[in-house]
From Swiss-Prot:
CDD domains (alphabetical): MPN_DUF2466
InterPro entries for the chain: MPN, RadC_JAB, RuvA_2-like, UPF0758, UPF0758_CS, UPF0758_N
PANTHER family on file: DNA REPAIR PROTEIN RADC, UPF0758 PROTEIN YEES-RELATED
Key words of the record: Hydrolase, Metal-binding, Metalloprotease, Protease, Zinc
Positions bound to Zn(2+): H171, H173, D184
Domain MPN: 100-222
Family stated for the protein in its record: Belongs to the UPF0758 family.
Lineage: Bacteria, Pseudomonadati, Chlorobiota, Chlorobiia, Chlorobiales
Name of the protein in question: UPF0758 protein Paes_0735
Motif (JAMM motif): 171-184
Signal peptide interval: none
Any one Gene Ontology molecular-function term assigned to this protein's record: metal ion binding
Length: 223
């Protein structure tokens, strides 16, 4: 059945105009964006099936190639889906500009949706002003964290450029285990020492997983 074969009051567009955007299901909202289905399934059915399998959170993390494995989703629709979630991420980032950091939990919340690829390890730098508000965040490196590969110069160069009063470093563990490794502790010690010399305090090193985090400060590991 095509969308045009539905009763007018049951079509997403008409429901949107009549009752407002909040009245639509996630599948109907997605259908408004993707517009057309296949010969076998209308776009609402395609979106319902897609969301029942993946859900919004997992769908947002699928690559273009993975999206195109879904029945009824070709290259153009896959790009539309990626674009929608990217716009959401950017809106989230803008809303958190100048966010004040009071705890490691604030850092964890701030980082939600900011990892380009959760299957790889990323090292982030958060530059803070004198009120502990985030001035800017940067990706410093991608790959396994290693004290021999992460040079303090790269991190503090960015902090100095942004006139940061203090910094927080953040990285993810793709395994989901957020316990600090020996390499994590070595990197933190090096950065703490460099920060003391430059008078730019390392406030914390936070390791994040999908649902939890580890704070060096909260575990009294900053010396």
């Amino acid at each position: 059945m095509r969308i045009h074969d539905l009763d007018p009051e049951n079509r997403p567009r008409e429901r949107f105009l009549r009752s407002g955007v909040s009245a639509l299901s996630s599948a109907e909202l997605m259908a408004l964006i993707l517009k057309t289905g296949t010969k076998k399934h209308n776009i609402i059915e395609t979106c319902q099936e897609m969301l029942s399998i993946y859900g919004l959170e997992k769908l947002a993390d699928l690559s273009l190639a993975e999206l195109q494995k879904i029945n009824g989703i070709g290259p153009a629709k896959a790009m539309q889906i990626k674009a929608v979630f990217e716009l959401h991420r950017r809106m989230h980032f803008r809303r958190n500009t100048n966010k004040k950091i009071r705890s490691a939990r604030d850092v964890f919340d701030y980082m939600q949706g900011r990892l380009p690829d959760e299957m790889r390890e990323h090292l982030f730098l958060l530059n803070l002003n004198t009120k502990n508000q985030i001035i800017r965040h940067e990706i410093i490196s991608v790959g396994t964290l290693n004290a021999s590969l992460i040079h303090p110069r790269e991190i503090f160069k960015e902090a100095i450029r942004e006139s940061a009063h203090a910094i927080i470093v953040v990285h993810n563990h793709p395994s989901g285990d957020v316990e600090a490794s020996n390499a994590d502790k070595q990197v933190t010690a090096v950065l703490k020492k460099a920060g003391s010399l430059l008078q730019i305090e390392l406030l914390d090193h936070v390791i994040i997983g999908r649902e939890t985090y580890f704070s060096f400060r909260e575990h009294s590991l900053l010396g």
